Design a protein with these regions (language model features):
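Bacterial Sec-dependent N-terminal signal peptides
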Residues: 1-27
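Phosphate-group recognition and catalysis centered on beta-loop-alpha active-site segments
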Residues: 17-302
Length: 302
């Protein structure tokens, strides 16, 4: 009973600050989102073109990428704002000292220099199944073009691209990324030049770019990432109900799924790397799962 009351309060609070706009998903979006996190991080170097190709090969219908702007205003695929020394080497194969990593902030570098880093050769103990290949960080447009060519050549279904904007107030102060609106506009310009139509959505933990997308690009699907347990606070911070709500998976309950569905939101939690937990979430009513192992979907019959 207490949970029902809380969810009713949330609905009232958000309705009060949300313009009347009925949520609807494009008809070509999947009934269930089988999302490859950073491609297939469990099997291939994260956020690389080979990782994305592997994801669609093993059955992902949606691939998630993280983006930053570079100094020369290009949309870079990377989870971290500078080299992650756990899996990044200099081009000659030498190690990057921990003290030196922050000398190479992507937003303060041109892409010609960024692409020289090797993000795929170094053994990564956290991901023992990950194939090791020498590969660099791609640009968003390059990645989309490569994946589209790959699925066409191999007669695979065309995926949805989940583009996560790595912005935050903290990153603003550290100059780790461009201002949110600038990142959004750059992503939209890149996507416009590709023949993918509406097969992408924009997500972030940062409410600012999502609010900007809703205002300037109302046709774009929005995903809201959260770690917060308080649904009331989460939705009031955003100011509207997104198309896709993506909480940390341990926060998901059947009541949350029911509430999301009552507001026409899709519930797609992150990041689930255990098959039994996947089954439990599906039983609770989630509309998709973000995982480092999209090959698991076939193994659980999804």
């Amino acid at each position: 009973m207490k949970r029902i009351v809380v969810l009713s309060v949330i609905a009232g609070c958000v309705a009060a600050c949300t313009a009347s706009r009925k949520l609807s998903m494009p008809e070509n979006y999947p009934a269930f989102y089988k999302e490859g996190h950073r491609g297939t991080r469990g099997l291939m170097p994260e956020n690389t073109i080979p990782s994305m190709k592997k994801a669609v090969e093993v059955g992902a219908n949606c691939i998630e990428v993280d983006v930053y702007l570079t100094k020369d205003k290009k949309v870079l695929i990377s989870h971290d704002p500078f080299p992650n020394i756990a899996h990044t080497l200099y081009n000659d194969g030498s190690e990057i000292a921990k003290a030196d990593a922050k000398k190479y902030v992507w937003y303060q570098m041109n892409y010609e220099d960024i692409k020289k880093f090797d993000v795929g050769s170094k053994p990564f103990p956290a991901w023992p199944q990950q194939q090791k290949i020498k590969v660099g960080l791609p640009l968003l447009g390059e990645l989309i073009d490569s994946v589209e060519a790959y699925v066409t050549a191999n007669k695979l279904p065309k995926p949805i691209y989940n583009i996560e904007l790595k912005t935050s107030i903290r990153f603003d102060s550290l100059k780790y990324n461009a201002p949110p609106a600038e990142v959004v506009d750059a992503v939209m310009e890149d996507v416009k030049g590709r023949n993918i139509g509406n097969r992408f959505y924009i997500q972030s933990f940062d409410v600012r770019p999502l609010q900007y997308v809703r205002k300037k690009y109302p046709q774009v699907v929005i995903g809201y990432l959260t770690t917060g347990k308080n649904l009331d606070s989460n939705f009031k911070s955003l100011g509207f109900y997104p198309h896709i709500y993506s909480p940390e998976f341990n926060l998901v309950t059947k009541a949350m799924a029911d509430f999301c569905h009552s507001k026409n939101m899709k519930l797609v939690p992150w990041t689930v790397n255990d098959k039994e937990k996947m089954k439990r979430l599906i039983a609770d009513g989630v509309d998709g799962i973000i995982t480092d192992y999209p090959n698991y979907f076939a193994e659980i019959g999804k």
